[in-house]
A protein has these predicted regions:
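Extracytoplasmic
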Residues: 3, 26, 47, 52, ...
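Mid-domain, small-residue-enriched loop/turn segments at the edges of structured enzyme/sensor domains
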Residues: 6-66
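Acidic/histidine-rich, surface-exposed loop or edge segments in extracytoplasmic proteins
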Residues: 1-2, 136
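Structured C-terminal helix/loop/strand segments within mature extracytoplasmic catalytic/sensor domains
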Residues: 11-13, 63-166
Length: 166
């Protein structure tokens, strides 16, 4: 939830927040926020200066699962434990959604705001484990939050995708 993330970053403060993002090597690590708005602490990751690709998201998840982020073992375990889990064709899927909107200035389109949805996490089935990052950007205006839709489609497709990778 956005408000909760903003409360955490406020409590961390600018220097500690920027330090963690840098130590985590999270995306482009730019937490400055929107130019002239002094909002990096509460908005840098919301369609602003902090950017990350699907590949970088998957690498981050791999590091989380391997306990390789610069935090305690307890912090790794707690983070893994609080992510929601879902079932999909025998797979147990753990992940987090994200939704934002891309406007004309960001995507250079004339169709107004478009919804962007993430679903990032990992899945286990028997002895197999995978990490994933699914990013979907609507091709036209949409008022529906894209993150939950992205998750639903991914969960439906996962069994077939995983079978093809064998």
């Amino acid at each position: 939830m956005l408000w909760f993330s903003q409360e955490i970053t406020r409590r961390l403060g600018n220097e500690r927040f920027a330090g963690y993002v840098s130590k985590f090597d999270y995306g482009n690590t730019d937490v400055a926020g929107n130019a002239g708005k002094n909002d990096g602490l509460t908005r840098s990751w919301v369609n602003s200066s902090l950017e990350i690709s699907p590949v970088e998201q998957a690498i981050f998840m791999r590091r989380l699962l391997a306990g390789e982020l610069p935090v305690s073992d307890k912090a790794h375990a707690m983070t893994r434990a609080i992510l929601p889990s879902f079932r999909a064709g025998g797979w147990t899927v753990h992940g987090k959604t994200g939704t934002t909107r891309l406007g004309d200035s960001a995507d250079k389109r004339s169709d107004g705001w478009r919804s962007l949805g993430w679903f990032v996490g990992w899945a286990n089935k028997d002895s197999r484990s995978i990490v994933f990052a699914r990013l979907v950007i609507d091709t036209k205006r949409s008022d529906t939050p894209k993150g939950p839709q992205t998750r639903a489609v991914f969960l439906k497709e996962l069994p077939n995708l995983a079978d093809k990778s064998n």
